[in-house]
Amino acid sequence: WVPGTRGNIDHIVIAPAGVFVVDAKAHKGRIEIRDRGGLFRTDYRLTVGGRDCSSLADGMGWQVQAVLTVLRDHGADPAPAVTPVLCFLEVEWPLFRAPDSFHGVLIESTRSLARVLTSTTVLTVAQADELAALLAERLPAK
Protein backbone atom coordinates (compact mmCIF):
# COMPACT_ATOMS: atom_id res chain seq x y z
CA TRP A 1 0.00 0.00 0.00
CA VAL A 2 1.06 3.53 -0.60
CA PRO A 3 0.79 5.58 2.60
CA GLY A 4 -1.57 8.52 2.24
CA THR A 5 -3.52 6.97 -0.64
CA ARG A 6 -6.24 4.39 -1.16
CA GLY A 7 -4.20 2.74 -3.87
CA ASN A 8 -1.84 -0.14 -3.96
CA ILE A 9 0.98 -1.25 -6.19
CA ASP A 10 0.66 -4.85 -7.41
CA HIS A 11 4.39 -5.58 -7.62
CA ILE A 12 7.66 -3.71 -7.28
CA VAL A 13 10.44 -5.69 -8.93
CA ILE A 14 14.10 -4.89 -8.33
CA ALA A 15 16.03 -6.74 -11.01
CA PRO A 16 19.40 -6.52 -12.74
CA ALA A 17 17.76 -4.27 -15.35
CA GLY A 18 16.44 -1.80 -12.76
CA VAL A 19 13.32 -1.02 -10.76
CA PHE A 20 9.94 -1.92 -12.24
CA VAL A 21 6.37 -1.26 -11.11
CA VAL A 22 4.35 -4.19 -12.46
CA ASP A 23 0.57 -4.25 -12.67
CA ALA A 24 -0.62 -7.79 -13.47
CA LYS A 25 -3.89 -8.18 -15.38
CA ALA A 26 -5.85 -11.34 -16.17
CA HIS A 27 -7.85 -9.90 -19.09
CA LYS A 28 -8.94 -12.14 -21.95
CA GLY A 29 -9.02 -11.41 -25.66
CA ARG A 30 -6.72 -10.06 -28.33
CA ILE A 31 -4.43 -7.20 -27.30
CA GLU A 32 -4.01 -4.34 -29.78
CA ILE A 33 -3.27 -0.66 -30.04
CA ARG A 34 -5.97 0.90 -32.21
CA ASP A 35 -6.31 4.38 -33.65
CA ARG A 36 -9.81 5.56 -32.79
CA GLY A 37 -9.15 9.04 -34.15
CA GLY A 38 -10.74 10.51 -37.21
CA LEU A 39 -9.36 11.71 -40.50
CA PHE A 40 -7.48 14.66 -39.03
CA ARG A 41 -6.34 13.40 -35.64
CA THR A 42 -5.01 10.30 -33.98
CA ASP A 43 -6.38 8.79 -30.80
CA TYR A 44 -4.51 5.61 -29.92
CA ARG A 45 -6.17 3.20 -27.51
CA LEU A 46 -4.94 0.04 -25.84
CA THR A 47 -7.64 -2.59 -26.31
CA VAL A 48 -8.03 -6.11 -25.00
CA GLY A 49 -10.87 -8.15 -26.46
CA GLY A 50 -12.21 -4.95 -28.02
CA ARG A 51 -12.46 -3.18 -24.64
CA ASP A 52 -10.59 0.07 -24.11
CA CYS A 53 -7.92 -0.56 -21.47
CA SER A 54 -5.97 2.67 -22.01
CA SER A 55 -6.73 3.84 -18.49
CA LEU A 56 -4.67 0.94 -17.11
CA ALA A 57 -1.53 2.44 -18.62
CA ASP A 58 -2.52 6.01 -17.86
CA GLY A 59 -3.13 5.12 -14.21
CA MET A 60 0.40 3.88 -13.60
CA GLY A 61 1.94 7.34 -13.35
CA TRP A 62 1.10 7.83 -9.68
CA GLN A 63 2.54 4.40 -8.84
CA VAL A 64 5.86 5.21 -10.50
CA GLN A 65 5.89 8.61 -8.79
CA ALA A 66 5.27 7.01 -5.38
CA VAL A 67 8.25 4.67 -5.81
CA LEU A 68 10.48 7.48 -7.12
CA THR A 69 9.53 9.70 -4.18
CA VAL A 70 10.54 7.00 -1.68
CA LEU A 71 13.83 6.42 -3.48
CA ARG A 72 14.69 10.13 -3.68
CA ASP A 73 13.55 11.02 -0.16
CA HIS A 74 15.62 8.26 1.40
CA GLY A 75 18.98 8.68 -0.15
CA ALA A 76 18.98 6.87 -3.48
CA ASP A 77 21.22 9.32 -5.33
CA PRO A 78 20.79 9.32 -8.16
CA ALA A 79 17.48 7.48 -7.97
CA PRO A 80 17.34 4.69 -10.54
CA ALA A 81 14.75 4.88 -13.28
CA VAL A 82 11.44 3.26 -12.40
CA THR A 83 9.79 1.55 -15.36
CA PRO A 84 6.02 0.93 -15.43
CA VAL A 85 4.87 -2.44 -16.82
CA LEU A 86 1.45 -3.88 -17.58
CA CYS A 87 1.80 -7.66 -17.53
CA PHE A 88 -1.11 -9.44 -19.22
CA LEU A 89 -1.51 -13.05 -18.15
CA GLU A 90 -4.17 -14.45 -20.48
CA VAL A 91 -4.43 -12.24 -23.56
CA GLU A 92 -4.09 -13.34 -27.17
CA TRP A 93 -0.95 -11.81 -28.65
CA PRO A 94 -0.88 -10.95 -32.36
CA LEU A 95 1.66 -12.84 -34.44
CA PHE A 96 3.01 -9.64 -35.98
CA ARG A 97 3.46 -6.20 -34.46
CA ALA A 98 2.49 -7.04 -30.91
CA PRO A 99 2.41 -3.84 -28.84
CA ASP A 100 5.57 -3.31 -26.81
CA SER A 101 4.56 -0.10 -25.05
CA PHE A 102 1.67 2.32 -24.67
CA HIS A 103 2.00 5.86 -23.28
CA GLY A 104 5.41 5.00 -21.83
CA VAL A 105 4.25 1.78 -20.15
CA LEU A 106 5.78 -1.51 -21.24
CA ILE A 107 3.23 -4.10 -22.37
CA GLU A 108 4.44 -7.61 -21.55
CA SER A 109 3.43 -11.23 -21.03
CA THR A 110 4.88 -13.23 -18.16
CA ARG A 111 7.41 -14.78 -20.53
CA SER A 112 8.52 -11.50 -22.11
CA LEU A 113 8.65 -9.78 -18.70
CA ALA A 114 11.29 -12.25 -17.54
CA ARG A 115 13.44 -11.27 -20.52
CA VAL A 116 12.98 -7.55 -19.83
CA LEU A 117 13.99 -7.92 -16.18
CA THR A 118 17.25 -9.64 -17.07
CA SER A 119 18.06 -8.02 -20.44
CA THR A 120 20.67 -5.62 -19.09
CA THR A 121 22.49 -5.03 -15.83
CA VAL A 122 22.23 -1.58 -14.30
CA LEU A 123 22.06 -2.63 -10.64
CA THR A 124 24.57 -4.67 -8.69
CA VAL A 125 23.34 -7.29 -6.23
CA ALA A 126 24.25 -4.97 -3.35
CA GLN A 127 22.34 -2.05 -4.90
CA ALA A 128 19.31 -4.26 -5.56
CA ASP A 129 19.35 -5.54 -1.97
CA GLU A 130 19.57 -1.99 -0.60
CA LEU A 131 16.69 -0.76 -2.77
CA ALA A 132 14.57 -3.80 -1.91
CA ALA A 133 15.03 -3.22 1.83
CA LEU A 134 14.19 0.48 1.52
CA LEU A 135 11.07 -0.08 -0.57
CA ALA A 136 9.86 -2.95 1.65
CA GLU A 137 10.14 -0.66 4.68
CA ARG A 138 8.53 2.43 3.13
CA LEU A 139 5.89 0.73 0.96
CA PRO A 140 4.94 -2.33 3.03
CA ALA A 141 2.75 -5.12 1.71
CA LYS A 142 -0.71 -5.20 3.20
Predicted regions and their residues:
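Surface-exposed interaction regions that form or flank ligand-binding interfaces
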Residues: 1-7, 15-19, 28-35, 39-142
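Phosphate-centric recognition/catalysis
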Residues: 10
